Amino acid sequence: MPEKGKPMDIHDTNGTLPDRGPTTSAFRGPDRIRRVACLGTGLIGGGFVALFLARGLDVIVWDPAPDAKDRLDQILTTAWTTLERLGARAEDRGTLSWASTAEEAVKTADFVQESAPERLELKRNLYASIELVTPPDVVIATSTSGFSIADLQAGGSQSTRVIVGHPFNPPYLIPLVEVAGAVHTSREALIAAEAFYQSIGKVVIRMDHEIPGFIANHLQAALEREAMHLVAEGHATPQQIDAAVVHGLAPRWSAIGPCMVRHMGSSAGGIGGYFERFNLGSERSLSHHTPPEFTPEFIKAMSEGCRTMEAGRDKATLSAARDRAVIETLLAQRHAGVSRHGV
């Protein structure tokens, strides 16, 4: 087990993470981050709380929802079972405390992870309240998947230390986090955030600029859109689609991504040769750029298919089964030497 506050090596990437240079002293780096403020404790925020605690960091939480504490307890119970299988130990676990206001949570923090509900006005008001009281050398990261930094800061501060730290759900299990900023965002803040996330075992994609949905959600949306069309047009059931992904695409994608799949599958000249011979018409026939109409028949087919796959299991049972399978995949990736970009 790594020393307290250090990453468990389940997400080790065999030394292939890019050298972004030393973390600047303008913002607190991993060696100075012992206390994280988490604003919001939904699935994403609660997942981050679990991850930070497992890495030995102290976490102060703020969430005004009446059921926030009970909800977080449930998330932590589920997450901790998973994290223990990945090597987390109770004696290394950080301490959890609650703040009565967002301002109280951030004023003593070394890093801030905001995961409030995706409501723009709510987030804008939150940033207006915390930016003046957060220590000036502390990075403020948002988990948002739909808003830009410019959206969040419109009409208020143009602080250069607010960045996107967008995870994939659940954050305590899936290694990816996408880091991005606006035009005015400090490069030093991005580097500091990247270094911190790497120090807790994350695989970081630091984007050159923001785009809606970032990278992974764009890819996921394209696949989901095609899946919806296959169901809407009567070509496949939800069960068939999920089977095709779980037993076809997913095992291969756990080792190499779609770009390398195409490169390795091209007979001559790799992916460059493929595009030189590319028949645009045949590819267009496989792709839809917009979702299908959500007719009652479509909704019924999707709902019935997913209920069949649930097989009477509740979400907690399904989540535990998912986590067990993902753990084994991550362990297999490590055993096989899968690095940041694949084999």
Enumerate the language-model features and the residues they cover:
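Hydrophobic packing residues within well-ordered alpha-helices of enzyme cores
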Residues: 72, 76, 130, 152-153
